[in-house]
Amino acid sequence: MTNAFAGKIALVTGASRGIGAATATALAAQGAHVILTARTAKDLEAVEDAIFDAGGSATIAPLDLTDGDSIARLAVAVTERWGKLDILVLNAAMLGTLSPVPAIDGAEFARLFTLNVTAQQVMIASFDALLRKSDAGRLLALTSSVGATPRAFWGAYGASKAALENLVECYGEEVKNLSQVRTVIVDPGRTRTAMRAKAYPGEDPSTVKEPSIVADAIVQMLKTEFATGHRLVVEG
């Protein structure tokens, strides 16, 4: 435990596993109180226990990000308890089925955009005021290289990440002269997650980096000053 983020309140979506869990754990290890969100309470409790065992502090908030009312209620709860939010990590996402663009299933496409884009806008809208109350509000959004570099069969997921990047960067431009809020796009690169295993079922997981490496890169970046619109690409 160190105290680099002592007094900071952080919220991480998709915090029950993978990059989200690793990032939440790393932030807590630096002294932040971390609000953990995901759909499954049991998995969140395991991350919370690990944080407590390491001497950190956390609060779990099980919710479905596609339920805008749940997000609004969480924002009210954070306002009442802490009155600010210093770090918001938008990590939760779904991959969907990799397929040619003409073969994309319309219903799945709608679900994918609901989580990967619409829910992210609702998160930004719901926590904007709390981020502005921080003396150094930071909003991070996890993306993928396919958001900026089109790749065959990745059209649905790539389009959702391109939309997310644009949304976050527009928000950053809107608030940069009105507050201390700064936005960051994080491209984690090849990382050992359940989503990557689904996308690359034949890949040897030992050949790609652990989520903790991405989390450490995020923490180190948050210790520095940077302009809004910063892009962090985690190599390896």
For each predicted feature, which ranges?
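Catalytic loop of short-chain dehydrogenase/reductase
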Residues: 94, 132, 136-163, 168-177, ...
